Amino acid sequence: MTNPQYLLRPVNPVFIAFSFVMAFLFNLMPWGTTLWIPDMVALVLVFWNIHQPRKVGMGVAFALGLLMDVHDARLLGEHAVAYTLLAYFAITIHRRVLWFTVYTQALHVLPLLFIAHAVPVVIRLAMGAPLPGWPLLVAPGIEALLWPLATAVLLAPQRRSVDVDETRPI
């Protein structure tokens, strides 16, 4: 049995903003120096850049990156550059990625998430910081594993009911 093909409603811009706020609040949690915690802002940013590239672009990515830089007290622009590159590459592949299943989409998104985590590391290494270690490589994998869940949650308000409602005019 195949999954039904859903006809999606237009996305509400308030819901997009709400999803970014919730992802940012997740990133604000006091994890300490734990490197394997997924970057939910990056995951939500890739999702909206793939599904709604005209509503969420590189400007939003840059602004969110600056917010993350201020939160992490890092060099101003580390996350901004990483998120801008992430948005650019996600918008570049968005038409191709949408043709695949959710699990294959996760495999397509995984290199983008690795790039997003590698850019701040390269910037810090150029500034003379030590190499952070292997747990940093786990975070993009966890984010890719969260891709099907993020897709289900973030597309849920747009999905129409599969059951026919007799009282609905359209």
Predicted regions and their residues:
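Terminal, non-globular segments
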Residues: 1-170
